[in-house]
């Protein structure tokens, strides 16, 4: 007998900042199917995961909701676990990266890397939000694209033209958190010296640990030269403080993959028979597999194996990469109702339908998978209801009515039984290779053969013929045994259907080894419908509910609440707006106005003319000389106003509620005095 394999399997850790959607579920379902197959074969397969619970995004969301980060991640984790459980994703352990195990492992791995000379420190200059008192990650900086000029773009790439750039290249940068203009500030950062592991990575990435397409992409990065990886962030930050470095925290992507180890270590504390080092030690003979999406390949195929190597741990056996999910041929869309949360799906449909559809489309490659909702309905109704379950529903009634539910010992078609037996190794091979679509095709081909044979024998017709009842029982006995084989083969994909079928068949939980053992002279339990057809109306209701989710989110207070404080004015037509002559003005001189509590006097250059303006911005600019030399926006055709202190010839533009919160508006660099604002 072959010795059972020791296998540890992980999926990427979902971020503890939002709900699970069907795109996420693609990964967890396929991982779960592979683990269930391994367990069905008698292997020791252990599936661990955790919530990725650190980072600025979590800290800021908790602050916005008026709760602690710990309260936020605890609530999200409970939601995630409920969604996974209801989808049949059966983790052996589901933990959190905000755990004592992860804190200890992250510290020990960092210290091992540092002590071996793989950590560097140097000063970096990055944007700092003076209002929030925090350094800004690229995604928390917005401005105009330096290439195409598109506004409201992130600090690292333009969603309009696709350009990539550094935050310092962004035009008119602002903090996406507070709206403040960020300032450049220097800070000491810690770097993992990834180039130290270039030779090892070149060998490991070509060892069969990656799919060929992924290995080819990694080779491009390796050929381009590896860079040191910034593994630190400055306070305030929700995460683990770097040992011996007050105010410095591990970047979330350092402790996130260590979360795989931490979750397994947590499981070891619950199951004493498990040995942490037997799975993670340098000389471990266990197998280690990571299932991930193609968007995080660089972390898992470069940084992670290098960290493990440097800290004295084993490397993954393989990193299995999959593509993205599209719906109806397009990116998931909230407005179209195709950005479907796992819970919204569960409110309308059986999760096993989607598990089967994903399996029918998942191959070994990294291509995207399309959830075509019309095809989904057709495939589930045709394959699961019309083929697999149909065999049992055709045969069970005759056995219960004609023989009190007793399955006779008979095999009236040995060739068909043998064909099922002969197909099992190929189906097993497809499961092992994660070629789930091939496995489903081969299983459905067997279901077609079984249905065709039963249709040819027509037990419903024979049952009406005197003296043919025994033959009917033999036909239906083989039909039920073929159904049982199909259920065992589908058990990794459809665990709930398998459990319900096992209850009907009156058998213990089946394993792959049970495929070769037919039931004979065996009492069945009453048959109840195992699956029902999908009604298109349920799909429509799910899509509409997903749109409602969007509407509900849209109704929540968004942004900074400024519009609620000061609602938008009544709509005007274009001619009314065009009548306002906005110009660029240079502030040549700015000074206090004697006897005025709120006013500053601004002497403006608008190109060919000079203008004098009084503006109520004194409270925000206690040193008016600092405004001199600045460009601002000026209403040039506003009728002059006679004031106590002189005549004001127009108005400069500023934003803010008043007091110290007044912000004089400025144009982009390159604008010239006198130019019209359009």
From Swiss-Prot:
GO CC annotation terms, alphabetical: cytosol
Cofactor: Zn(2+)
GO MF assignments: ATP binding; metal ion binding; methionine-tRNA ligase activity; tRNA binding
InterPro entries: aa-tRNA-synth_I_CS (IPR001412), Anticodon_Met (IPR041872), Met-tRNA-synth_bsu_C (IPR004495), Met-tRNA_ligase_1 (IPR023458), Met-tRNA_synth (IPR014758), Methionyl/Leucyl_tRNA_Synth (IPR015413), MetRS_core (IPR033911), MetRS_Zn (IPR029038)
Predominant location category: cytoplasm
Annotated catalysed reactions: tRNA(Met) + L-methionine + ATP = L-methionyl-tRNA(Met) + AMP + diphosphate
Keywords on record: Aminoacyl-tRNA synthetase, ATP-binding, Cytoplasm, Ligase, Metal-binding, Nucleotide-binding, Protein biosynthesis, RNA-binding, tRNA-binding, Zinc
GO biological process entries: methionyl-tRNA aminoacylation
Binding site for Zn(2+): 145, 148, 158, 161
S-S bridge residues: none
Chain sites annotated for binding ATP: 334
Protein's job: Is required not only for elongation of protein synthesis but also for the initiation of all mRNA translation through initiator tRNA(fMet) aminoacylation.
Quaternary structure (record): Homodimer.
PANTHER family named in the record: METHIONINE--TRNA LIGASE, METHIONINE--TRNA LIGASE, CYTOPLASMIC
Protein name, UniProt field: Methionine--tRNA ligase
Organism, scientific name: Ectopseudomonas mendocina (strain ymp)
């Amino acid at each position: 007998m072959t010795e059972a394999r020791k296998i540890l399997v992980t999926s990427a850790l979902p971020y503890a900042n939002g709900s699970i959607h069907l795109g996420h579920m693609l990964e967890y379902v396929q991982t779960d199917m592979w683990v269930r197959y391994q367990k069905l074969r008698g292997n020791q397969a252990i599936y661990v995961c955790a919530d990725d619970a650190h980072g600025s995004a979590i800290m800021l969301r908790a602050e916005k909701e008026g709760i602690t980060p710990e309260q936020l991640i605890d609530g999200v984790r409970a939601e995630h676990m409920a969604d996974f459980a209801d989808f049949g994703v059966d983790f052996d352990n589901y933990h959190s990266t905000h755990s004592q195990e992860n804190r200890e492992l992250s510290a020990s791995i960092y210290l091992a890397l540092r002590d071996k000379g793989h950590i560097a420190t140097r000063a970096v200059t990055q944007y700092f939000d003076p209002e929030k008192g925090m350094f800004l990650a690229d995604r928390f900086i917005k401005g105009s694209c330096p290439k195409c000029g598109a506004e409201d773009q992130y600090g690292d790439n333009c969603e309009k033209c696709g350009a990539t750039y550094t935050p310092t290249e962004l035009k008119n940068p602002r903090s996406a958190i507070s709206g403040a203009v960020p300032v450049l500030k220097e800070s000491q950062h810690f770097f993992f010296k990834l180039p130290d592991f270039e030779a090892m990575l070149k060998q490991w990435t070509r060892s069969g640990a990656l799919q060929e397409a992924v290995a080819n992409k990694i080779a491009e990065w390796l050929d381009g030269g590896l860079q040191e990886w910034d593994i630190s962030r400055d306070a305030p930050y929700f995460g683990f403080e770097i040992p011996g470095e007050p105010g410095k925290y591990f970047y979330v992507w350092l402790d996130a993959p260590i979360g795989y180890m931490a979750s397994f270590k947590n499981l070891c504390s619950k199951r004493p028979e498990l040995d942490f080092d037997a799975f993670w030690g340098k000389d471990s003979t266990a197998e280690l597999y990571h299932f991930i999406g193609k968007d995080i390949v660089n972390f898992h195929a470069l940084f992670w194996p290098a960290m493990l190597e440097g800290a004295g741990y084993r490397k993954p056996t393989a990193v299995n990469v999959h593509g993205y999910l599209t719906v109806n041929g397009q990116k998931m869309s909230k407005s179209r109702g195709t950005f479907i949360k796992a819970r919204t799906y569960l409110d309308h449909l059986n999760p096993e339908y989607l598990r089967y559809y994903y399996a029918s489309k998942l191959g070994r490659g990294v291509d995207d998978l399309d959830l075509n909702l019309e095809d989904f309905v057709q495939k589930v109704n045709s394959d699961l209801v019309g083929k697999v379950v149909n065999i049992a529903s055709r045969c069970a009634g005759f056995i219960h009515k004609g023989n009190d539910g007793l399955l006779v010992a008979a095999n009236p078609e040995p060739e068909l039984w043998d064909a099922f037996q002969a197909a099992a190794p190929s189906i097993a091979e497809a499961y092992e290779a994660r070629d789930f679509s091939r496995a489903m095709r081969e299983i459905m081909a067997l279901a077609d053969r079984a249905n065709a044979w039963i249709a040819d024998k027509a037990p419903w017709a024979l049952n009406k013929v005197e003296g043919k009842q025994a033959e009917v029982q033999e036909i239906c006995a083989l039909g039920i045994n073929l159904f049982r084989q199909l259920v065992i083969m589908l058990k990794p994909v459809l665990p709930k259907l398998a459990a319900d079928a096992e209850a009907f068949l009156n058998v213990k939980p089946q394993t792959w080894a049970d495929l070769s053992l037919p039931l004979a002279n065996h009492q069945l339990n009453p048959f109840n419908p195992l699956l029902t057809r999908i009604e298109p109306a349920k799909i429509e209701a799910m899509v509409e509910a997903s749109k409602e989710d969007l509407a509900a989110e849209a109704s929540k207070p968004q942004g900074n609440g400024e519009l609620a404080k000061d609602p938008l004015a009544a709509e005007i037509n274009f001619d009314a707006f065009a009548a306002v002559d906005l110009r660029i003005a240079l502030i040549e001189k700015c000074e206090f106005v004697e006897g005025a509590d709120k006013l500053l006097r601004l002497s403006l250059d608008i190109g060919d003319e000079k203008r004098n303006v009084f503006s109520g911005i004194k409270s925000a600019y206690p040193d008016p000389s600092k405004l001199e030399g600045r460009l601002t926006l000026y209403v040039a055709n506003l009728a002059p106003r006679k004031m106590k202190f002189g005549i004001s010839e127009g108005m400069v533009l500023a934003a803010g509620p008043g007091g110290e919160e007044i912000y004089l508006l400025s144009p982009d660099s390159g604008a010239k005095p006198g130019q019209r604002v359009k």
